[in-house]
């Protein structure tokens, strides 16, 4: 592992503190919220910058200063979902627009995979949209969302492919910003981003390894507790 790949985590940490010093979004307490005071939000932008920097470094190293469509489409999807999340943080987008945007972004993200069967594409879109929304639902509960992302990325990275482990360092750097005291929330920009990342990693992960069938099952196992807890909470709440 090249030492340069630590840079994205440092960039995430720095951008996180820049967002704290110069806030672009504020989360105001609500009846359903877990916080009582205004908290700086949209921390997902720091994570996005870290992911982009990692992708650039990895792309330049792997492809000798060139990028494949995979990287371009993947980053585009992450950027779009983060932007949608940011506007939802600051302007409260309508449910129909959010849902439509999530479906479009999910379909775009699937262009980075080898899925071609219409039924599987539909199932994958449902998984991605659902994962985005449960991440959004569970965000803000004692760093639960970012902690699960760290666990998922680190575990899948150690088991299957190292790129995911590098993502865990980016997530960890954001976690450390809020370690002793919450300074900045992920916001919808961050929860949407993490949801898309996790879902696409589950769907596309098997193609990166010789353990194709076992990989898909294993990736789901890594997220089982989070999926079950979030689903149960949603059912119990409504």
PLM regions with names:
Residues 1-231:
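"…together with the soluble PPM/PP2C metallo-phosphatase catalytic core" -> "…together
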Residues 231-238:
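Juxtamembrane interface at the ends
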